[in-house]
Curated annotation (Swiss-Prot):
Gene source species: Vitis vinifera
Membership in a protein family: Belongs to the eIF-2B alpha/beta/delta subunits family. MtnA subfamily.
EC numbers: 5.3.1.23
GO CC terms: cytoplasm; nucleus
Site (Transition state stabilizer) location in chain: 176
GO BP field: L-methionine salvage from methylthioadenosine
Lineage, top ranks: Eukaryota, Viridiplantae, Streptophyta, Embryophyta, Tracheophyta
Protein's name according to its UniProt entry: Methylthioribose-1-phosphate isomerase
Role, per record: Catalyzes the interconversion of methylthioribose-1-phosphate (MTR-1-P) into methylthioribulose-1-phosphate (MTRu-1-P).
């Protein structure tokens, strides 16, 4: 991967793609430097995802698909049948999905792309037809993510206005980064905050620093300042005190994977926020596209939790700086935790807000109704 010094009109555009070319904003260097890395194929894409150049469940899925799209676009000579092309693509996708195991969006995207590849191979007479079908499907994912995020924002803002008492002066707390830098654009939880701000009813957004990789202080604060949204950065450990002081009306977070019962895996520290919100009678929402929901998992106990390098805690700047902890100390560094569904008031999606019937979510029924209505 090579650094790109080209200027980009929108410094918050994490994914810059045109057919045959992909550049990813190196989020490890934000907010002090804006550096784009050239991605030439699936191997570059895998390392960019694994090394946190790009992060955020939706962005990871799109970056993976487009990294392979770039490789396919620049294949000079491919000798083989349509079945050979399908085998080539499927092997690359299997490799890409190993880069980050917790985010369901990546595995969901791979499954969908494999379906496109299979259908194309069954009817195509040549390899290029299979490659073309894959390219179009990967590029569609980029466009669809932005549209889904804007819908999440609108549904979330509308729901908050109708369900929170003082809905004309909302203060919202969020965690990690769920904005343009974590998606193809606009964002999920941060997209809701953007929509609330656009409606003129946001008093203040609060963002946690989100240790140890500091996605909140480095990325979310950067986006909020960029958009001139009234915002305050807090230490992770200050969240409960902020709620106790009566300065939070709602907590909204993103999701890397949502189980069928509503249990949600998200950035480490989310569970603590949900517990504090419950204690202080503050509604806690998850904002995520339907692609983040994994109906194959009955509960959060089945979600695989990725563990990150000890260096993220032993060294400053999320492992990129100098050593700050004593040599020889043991480290436990899970990247995510699971928030039980009983702590979640609603799940904001691009098809509406999933609320509980009684004390439980019926996510499967919601998705069935939402997708069947859109197809009529």
């Amino acid at each position: 991967m090579a650094d790109s010094n080209s200027k980009h009109q929108d410094s918050l555009q994490s994914i810059c793609y045109k057919r045959g070319s992909l550049q990813l904003l190196d989020q490890r260097k934000l907010p002090l430097e804006t550096v784009y890395l050239e991605i030439k194929g699936a191997d570059d894409g895998w390392h960019a995802i694994r090394d946190m150049v790009v992060r955020g469940a939706p962005a990871i899925a799109i970056a993976a698909a487009l990294s392979l799209a770039v490789e396919v676009s620049n294949l000079e000579d491919f000798i083989g049948t349509s079945d050979d092309a399908a085998s080539f693509l499927n092997s690359k996708l299997d490799y890409l999905v190993t880069s980050r195991p917790t985010a369901v969006n990546l595995s969901d995207a791979v499954t969908k792309l494999k379906g496109v590849i299979s259908n194309a191979a069954a009817t195509a007479f040549e390899a290029m037809s299979v490659f073309q079908a894959f390219l179009e499907a990967a590029e569609d994912m980029l466009r669809e993510d932005v549209a889904a995020n804007r819908a999440i924002g609108l549904y979330g803002a509308s729901f908050l206005q109708s369900h929170i008492k003082d809905s004309k002066n909302l203060s919202i707390l969020t965690h990690c980064n769920t904005g343009s830098l974590a998606t193809a654009g606009y964002g999920t939880a941060l997209g809701v905050i953007r929509s609330v701000h656009a409606e003129g009813i946001l008093l203040r957004a609060y963002c946690t620093e989100t240790r140890p990789f500091n996605q909140g202080s480095r990325l979310t604060a950067f986006e909020l300042v960029h958009d001139n949204i009234p915002a305050t950065l807090i230490a992770d450990s200050a969240a409960a005190a902020l709620m106790q002081a009566g300065r939070v009306d709602a907590v909204i977070v993103g999701a890397d994977r949502v189980a069928a019962n509503g249990d949600t895996a998200n950035k480490i520290g989310t569970y603590s926020l949900a517990l504090s919100a419950k204690h202080h009678h503050i509604p806690f929402f998850v904002a995520a596209p339907l692609t983040s929901i994994d109906l194959t998992l009955s509960s959060g106990q089945e979600i695989v939790i990725e563990e990150r390098s000890p260096k993220e805690l032993l060294n400053s700047r999320g492992g990129l700086g100098e050593q700050v902890a004593a040599s020889g100390i043991c480290v436990w560094n899970p990247a995510f935790d699971v928030t039980p569904a009983d702590l979640i008031a609603g799940i904001i999606t691009e098809k509406g807000v999933i609320t509980k019937t009684g004390d439980v979510f019926d996510i499967k029924d919601f998705i069935h109704n939402a997708t069947s209505h859109c197809c009529k």
